[in-house]
């Protein structure tokens, strides 16, 4: 039932050009104590047969959905462009879980992310961790080397630090960036983008905080001014 419901939602969203983060991968069947902070978390133990036939099956069903059509603009030999259509996987995004599988955090589990998800199921998309800002055990380096794409985090001291002199950092960083860009490119996020287009980013969190601080202050000043004018 889980697989059927998730598959239906993922496929219909994909037909509209959306990518859907299927979660939480995997064996995350309880909310209590799944991630109590720092190094504490639920550790799930199971045999391989049960994992494959029960706990991974809904995710596998999503990964093996029929492909969907995507419209795009194709460059011609004469330099002109025309509308074209291709097929893409219906499921291109996934979120890992807080818990451990055995003693290994699911979001940094090589056999799960690279062995099964990317290797056996042929998944090429975006793998993100569950949201956390302080959990030391959810190591970003472990995540990226296991086959993950990015961490859903907000504190600088928990983010992946790229070493420009490290060959392995370039290797894993390139693979992670490719999976993210692949997912975005194969969605309606790039709809209408042509050579020469200018992509404008959204405001940063700092800009938004400044705006949300100044705007109420200005409204308060105007309100006080109107009150005193009435009197």
What are the roles of these predicted feature ranges?
Residues 1-231:
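Glycoside hydrolase catalytic-domain context in secreted enzymes
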């Amino acid at each position: 039932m889980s697989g059927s419901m998730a598959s239906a939602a993922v496929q219909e969203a994909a037909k509209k050009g959306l990518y859907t983060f299927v979660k939480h991968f995997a064996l995350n069947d309880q909310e209590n104590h799944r991630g109590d902070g720092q190094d504490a978390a639920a550790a799930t133990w199971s045999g391989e047969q049960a994992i494959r036939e029960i706990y991974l099956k809904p995710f596998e069903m999503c990964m093996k959905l029929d492909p969907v059509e995507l419209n795009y603009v194709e460059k011609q030999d004469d330099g002109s462009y025309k509308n074209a259509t291709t097929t893409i996987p219906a499921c291109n995004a996934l979120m890992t879980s807080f818990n451990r599988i055995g003693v290994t955090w699911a979001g940094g589990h090589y056999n799960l992310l690279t062995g099964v998800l990317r290797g056996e199921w042929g998944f090429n998309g975006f793998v993100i961790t569950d949201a956390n800002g302080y959990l030391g055990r959810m190591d970003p380096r472990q995540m990226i080397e296991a086959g993950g794409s990015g961490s859903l985090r907000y504190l600088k001291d928990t983010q992946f630090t790229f070493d420009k002199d490290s060959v392995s950092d370039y290797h894993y960083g390139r693979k992670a960036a490719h999976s993210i860009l692949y997912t975005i490119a194969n969605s309606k996020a790039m709809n209408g983008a042509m050579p020469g287009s200018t992509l404008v980013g959204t405001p940063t969190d700092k800009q938004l905080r400044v705006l949300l601080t100044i705007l109420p202050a200005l409204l308060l000043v105007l309100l006080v001014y109107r009150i005193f004018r009435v009197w």
